[in-house]
């Protein structure tokens, strides 16, 4: 016979599981939209003030906000802080790719993007190894936020030791002198296209197909990778 205590305990567990699923979804959304906005904001900073400064600002954003996350007291606070953290993560990508592609003009851009993407996975693997040595529990998880704050030292290193993109410096100098930016045939696209033009013919269909091809793997990848752990817990 099921007692009242057991029923109450089961009801509490059901509510906690529902809340966990809800906030997990919110945190994934915060990551995706935060990264998208961060790419725009910090990408603009990189265009205006230099790739190195844009990259350093991105690192300071996600590491500094990770430190702030150590002090959160509610899921809502964590949601906001995670959004800001992910803005920094999203800002690192365009500035890093731009700096590498402009510094190594002869290298393949897809290859450089792949190197950065692979490096991110290496970081995830190293974090997993840390978790193997120290458990993350309900009562002991805030140290993970401090671990995320460690890259602030990397931001300082970027500011002091990483040289600015020679292409960006040349464009800036040409702009200050009132001259046309130096042209590099390996970097110059066949046609200069404004951002809004990709949503008009004849580029509209190409844009829509590109969005569709990017959406499908993102939905499948994020949908499966972020919910797999919760499904595994429910199964066994």
Cite the ranges covered by each PLM segment.
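Cytoplasmic helix-loop-helix junction between adjacent transmembrane helices
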Residues: 81-118
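Symmetry-related core transmembrane helices of the 12-TM Major Facilitator Superfamily/SLC fold
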Residues: 142-159
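Extracellular/periplasmic helix-loop-helix junction of adjacent transmembrane segments
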Residues: 1-37
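Helix-breaking motifs and short loop linkers at transmembrane-helix boundaries and internal kinks
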Residues: 50, 71-77, 105
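Extracytoplasmic gate region of multi-pass secondary transporters
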Residues: 201-236
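C-terminal ends and interior cores of transmembrane alpha-helices
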Residues: 60-73, 132-133
């Amino acid at each position: 016979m099921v007692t009242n205590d057991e029923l109450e305990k089961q009801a509490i567990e059901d509510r906690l599981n529902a809340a966990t699923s809800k906030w997990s979804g919110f945190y994934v959304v915060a990551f995706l939209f935060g990264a998208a906005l961060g790419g725009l904001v910090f990408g603009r900073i990189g265009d205006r003030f230099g790739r190195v400064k844009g990259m350093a600002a991105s690192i300071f954003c996600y590491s500094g906000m990770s430190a702030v996350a150590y002090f959160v007291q509610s899921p809502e606070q964590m949601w906001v802080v995670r959004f800001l953290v992910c803005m920094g993560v999203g800002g690192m990508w365009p500035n890093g790719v731009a700096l590498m592609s402009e510094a190594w003009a002869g290298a393949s851009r897809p290859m450089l993007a792949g190197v950065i993407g692979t490096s991110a996975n290496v970081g995830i693997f190293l974090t997993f190894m840390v978790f193997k040595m120290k458990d993350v529990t309900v009562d002991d998880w805030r140290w993970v936020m401090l671990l995320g704050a460690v890259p602030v030292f990397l931001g300082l290193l970027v500011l002091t030791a990483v040289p600015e993109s020679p292409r960006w410096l040349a464009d800036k100098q040409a702009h200050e002198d009132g001259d046309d930016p130096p042209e590099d045939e390996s970097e110059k696209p066949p046609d200069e296209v404004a951002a809004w033009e990709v949503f008009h013919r004849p580029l509209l269909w190409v844009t829509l197909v590109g969005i569709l091809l990017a959406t499908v793997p993102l939905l499948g990848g994020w949908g499966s990778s972020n919910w797999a752990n919760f499904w595994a817990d429910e199964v066994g």
